[in-house]
Amino acid sequence: MTKIIVAQDAPVLVAIDIAKARHEVLIAIPDKKRRRRLTVLNELADFNRLATALKEYGRPVRVAFEATGNYHRALAYHLATSGFEVKLVSSVALARTREALNNSWAKNDPKDAQVILHMMEIGNEQYYHD
């Protein structure tokens, strides 16, 4: 079996599919194969719970999401002020990548979080400015 070697400063990647009431979160830890899933309600208590969970990894954290209406703004602000690197994924690029990876236009929140994570892994993300 091949041992996975990861740089000490490799960031934890966090992909978030934004929605009105709840956000689907997919977390990829550099030295682990399994990914962690979370559902975060669109309220401050859950934002704090997510920020605390991310700080516990003791590594740099990079968060990316697709801007969806104004629903992303509160969470993005909270994560940015908590010291995390916040990125944006283009809606058009996300749709095209989802179609290419899944050979389908089918869309659901966990699948979108996986596609956002894939886009982060290949570096297809933009700086977030609010």
PLM-predicted stretches and their roles:
Residues 1-130:
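Phosphate- and other anionic-substrate recognition elements at nucleic-acid/protein interfaces
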